[in-house]
Curated annotation (Swiss-Prot):
CDD domains associated with the record: TOPRIM_recR (cd01025)
Zinc finger (C4-type): 60-75
GO MF, any single term: zinc ion binding
Matches recorded under NCBIfam families: recR
Lineage: Bacteria, Pseudomonadati, Pseudomonadota, Alphaproteobacteria, Hyphomicrobiales
Protein name: Recombination protein RecR
Source organism per UniProt: Bartonella tribocorum (strain CIP 105476 / IBS 506)
GO term, biological process aspect, one: DNA recombination
Keywords per UniProt: DNA damage, DNA recombination, DNA repair, Metal-binding, Zinc, Zinc-finger
Family annotation (InterPro entries): DNA_Rcmb_RecR (IPR000093), Rcmb_RecR (IPR023627), Rcmb_RecR_Znf (IPR015967), TOPRIM_dom (IPR006171), TOPRIM_RecR (IPR034137)
Amino acid sequence: MSKYIAGPEIERLIQILARLPGLGPRSARRAALHLIKKKETLLEPLGAAVQAAIEKVGICSVCGNVDTIDPCSICTDSRRDDTTIIVVEDIADLWALERAKTLAARYHVLGGRLSPLDGIGPDELNIATLIQRVVQNPITEIILAVNATVEGQTTAHYITDQLSNFPVKITRLAHGVPVGGELDYLDDGTLAAAVQARTNL
């Protein structure tokens, strides 16, 4: 009896797809079969897009966003407010706020949130680089757009404490962000209201 149902290459494709968020083994099998059936219109363009991403996409050295240029297109956009930095946990949160089109400011991606139980401390996050940006630039406001989770709020308080000696206003998102909620799952209107109703810490 064969080790593989449909060949090792297909099994490998299924295993890789199953690692994606929201895809379990069954969904990965369905996705793999769909890609194979649509080889010319889906599988080949997907392969080309993945290869292009491998070759051209990188992390912005200023804010931590992903882009094909460094600094990224947000950091090089002269129409944005240079005095305000929106701090987010992950790139998905940055994208969610950009979709809401509420504030043309700069961003800073932490790369996660403080979680001692998971071994994630300040040194594992981009907090030192945030402080460096505040020191080197005329920043007047830091908006802490972290998720309304225990870890997110712990991260917000830690950053507030680290910036307490700087002449910078620190605010956070308010109305519309439910406790325990994550930014990437909120609709654009809710996010817009949250940004406009931000409060002091």
